[in-house]
């Protein structure tokens, strides 16, 4: 995430963030953590960084686990929520694959290196095609315009603040999903045996 969205080519560990603002506080916190890590590396501390992509699977249903929310909605209500036209690319990785990647980094990683722990680069449309195939369930494809998604996100955020729960959707989430986020985990595969 800290490397930013992909601009034509999958993002790798040596990629630099495009000249774009951070979409979420989560992204900002990762960038700040990188600066702290650099300071510790300069002091001789051994540090390896894991960079998971769009993780899904068991866990709290927060903004960071929004893909799992989409899967639950798909399975429960048989609805595919598609922002815009659903052509934007994301890199989806299962939480257990990330856990295995973390173990590999601890065993084989090199200090000062970062490793992208990713899965497949697919559009949201393709993601739902795969979900339909795996689950054996068809769902209605509900395409949501950007202005509508932003309006719903603002209302949801206000309601969540007032009632004290985590919002289902935020404006940051909407803006994030409007970009392409293709990543390459080639380095983790070559150096660590990550699959």
Where do the protein language model's features map onto the residues?
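Mid/C-terminal beta-alpha module of Rossmann-like enzyme folds, strongest
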Residues: 101-168, 185
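Conserved beta-loop-beta element that borders a ligand/cofactor-binding pocket
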Residues: 35-58
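Active-site helix of classical SDR
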Residues: 29
